[in-house]
UniProtKB/Swiss-Prot annotation:
SUPFAM superfamilies referenced in this protein's UniProt entry, alphabetically: Anticodon-binding domain of a subclass of class I aminoacyl-tRNA synthetases, Methionyl-tRNA synthetase (MetRS), Zn-domain, Nucleotidylyl transferase
Name of the protein in question: Methionine--tRNA ligase
Organism of origin: Baumannia cicadellinicola subsp. Homalodisca coagulata
Subunit and interaction comment: Monomer.
Disulfide bonds: none
Main location group: cytoplasm
CDD domains attached to this UniProt entry: Anticodon_Ia_Met, MetRS_core
Cofactor(s) demanded: Zn(2+)
Length: 547
């Protein structure tokens, strides 16, 4: 059971500002949002922040290719990202950018602190340089033969076939992906963060028991291999923050990106007067700090980032919540197969609630990959949300409206069943709190099945035919509406927009603390369709639009 402080700062990994969000990105934002919404519902003071990762060579080159400035491009992308996230009902308190005054000041301040503490080293390195474009080539802008397995077409940092990691200069027959020419080797003096100094601090943090077992085991592998000094500088031309008193040198994006968490929170504090910055980032902070991230960036967040914080005399994360990748119909996302689906393309064809629910049925606290199978997606959403939950309200509301002027009865027909549903809040709440979202959904759907069995056995459509059993009909259907209310209370973190519609129908707020008291002698609103069924033709249209 995760013990959560009363004050919490939650972040998602920063989307890179050179392209659109896709359904892979949305997994993390939805997972974090469900957890954040649950914590808020249970009375925690939560601040949920994110930002665009807006620096680096890829952004500089793409902007140049598009004939615009990097600033213009990242501003456009930022607006697009914020629109997509809002339509997916992601409840950020602040969504910002790493290209900000707050972040620049923080990066320079942290760098100066590290430098004063003797943690910044200088040394000469050899780099690959494109003589056509006059640019030092980042790892992902050079390809060649893997130095270990000798297979071709591998990037400059690691082999996707054998898993080897290496320096770009180790590639056999390297070629620039920009010009296709063989790059030349050029020397340059770079700045390095003395990461090995923090080996024991990081080992202790890893052994604290807070991290997922798979994550802790992976970090132990890195410790066993030995930590290396970290190159935190890049040569001009580069889009980012220039290193003070070092002309032509810029901070590497992976230094200023995680500091962007602090920058985004600082910006939120500047916009409000009710948040004390030091309560969340000071070394003595009693607040919790959680980073939701994908498993591909565990090294940066589990090794590099806490070391930077330790060296800067700032607090370390309480925990990293790491998730796996999204596959589509069992395979990696692919542009050619039409499965690298943009968030905006999805939203043009389908309601955000569908994906929020489907991801929730798959999410757990481990780092296994999650498959978005479209046949299962359609069947699961229709069976669970439409058939079991919404139809429960629709069937009973029709009788309440027709015979009882939309007013619920004065008594609960089955108090034992109602209490059983309320008692389930303990286990369901524990599952949400521990990020075992799929378990929470399973338990909620077991309740939904039981509610529908209750209605099926009571047969209100038969009872309605006998005018002498009007009170029974009233009690049965009022019970059905009350069970719907409890189901929607539990689903509120997963389906916030549907929950708002349910509140309008029920004419009351959904509240975990007050649900022990049923709705009796209570006027509800006329029932309106809350959500439509999905069809495979809608999914096909979405995929066709992706090609």
């Amino acid at each position: 059971m995760i013990q959560v402080a009363s004050k919490i700062l939650v972040t998602c990994a920063l989307p890179y500002a050179n392209g659109s969000l896709h359904l892979g990105h949305m997994l993390e934002h939805i997972q974090a949002d469900i957890w954040v919404r649950y914590q808020r519902i249970r009375g925690k003071q939560v601040y949920f922040i994110c930002a665009d990762d807006a620096h680096g060579t890829p952004i500089m080159l793409k902007a140049k290719q598009s004939g615009i400035t990097p600033e213009a491009m990242i501003n456009k992308i930022n607006q697009e990202h914020q629109t997509d996230l809002a339509q997916f009902e992601i409840s950020y308190d602040n969504y910002y950018s790493t290209h900000s005054d707050e972040n620049r000041e923080l990066v320079i301040s942290i760098y100066n602190t590290l430098k004063e503490n003797g943690l910044i080293k200088k040394r000469m390195i050899s780099q690959l340089y494109d003589p056509i474009h006059n640019i030092f080539l980042p790892d992902r802008f050079v390809k060649g033969y893997c130095p270990r397995c000798k297979l071709p077409d591998q990037y400059g940092d690691n082999c996707e076939i054998c898993g080897a990691t290496y320096h770009p200069t180790d590639l056999i027959d390297p070629k620039s992906t920009l010009s296709g020419v063989t790059p030349v080797i050029s020397k340059s003096k770079h700045l390095f963060f003395d990461l090995p100094v923090f080996s024991e601090v990081l080992r202790a943090w890893t052994r604290s028991g807070a991290l997922q077992e798979q994550v802790a085991n992976k970090m132990q592998e890195w410790f066993d291999m030995g930590l290396q000094q970290w190159d935190i500088s890049r040569d001009a031309p580069y889009f980012g923050f220039e290193v003070p008193d070092t002309p032509g040198k810029y901070f590497y994006v992976w230094l200023d990106a995680p500091i962007g968490y602090i920058g985004a929170f600082k910006n939120l504090c500047n916009k409000r007067n009710d948040i004390i910055f030091d309560e969340f980032w000071h070394l003595s902070s009693k607040a919790d700090l959680y980073h939701f991230i994908g498993k591909d960036i565990t090294y940066f967040h589990g090794i590099f980032w806490p070391a930077i914080l330790e060296g800067s005399k700032l607090r370390k994360p309480t925990n990293l919540f790491v998730h796996g990748y999204v596959t589509i119909n069992g395979a990696k996302m692919s542009k050619s197969r039409g499965t690298l689906i943009k968030a905006s393309t999805y939203l043009a064809h389908l309601d955000a609630s569908y994906l929020r629910y489907y991801y929730a049925t798959k999410l757990s606290s481990d780092i296994n990959d999650i498959d978005l199978n479209f046949n299962d997606f359609v069947n699961r959403v229709n069976a669970d949300i439409i058939n079991k939950v919404i139809n429960l309200a629709a069937r009973n509301a029709s009788f309440i409206q027709k015979y009882f002027d939309n007013k619920l009865s004065a008594t609960i027909e089955d108090q034992y069943l109602y209490d059983y549903f309320v008692t389930a809040s303990v286990s369901i709440g524990e599952a949400f709190n521990n990020r075992e979202t799929s378990r929470a959904i399973r338990e909620i759907m077991i309740l939904a099945d039981r509610a529908n069995v209750y209605i099926h056995k009571k047969e209100p459509w038969v009872v309605a035919k006998n005018k002498y059993y009007q009170q029974d009909l009233h009690n049965i259907c009022s019970m059905g509406i009350n069970l719907f209310r409890l189901l929607m209370t539990y689903l509120q973190p997963v389906l916030p927009n549907l929950a708002i519609q349910a509140e309008a129908f029920l004419n009351t707020k959904l509240n975990w603390d007050s649900m022990v008291i049923p709705l009796t002698n209570h006027k509800i609103s006329p029932f309106k369709t809350l959500l439509q069924r999905i069809t495979l033709s809608q999914v096909k249209a979405m995929i066709d639009a992706t090609h």
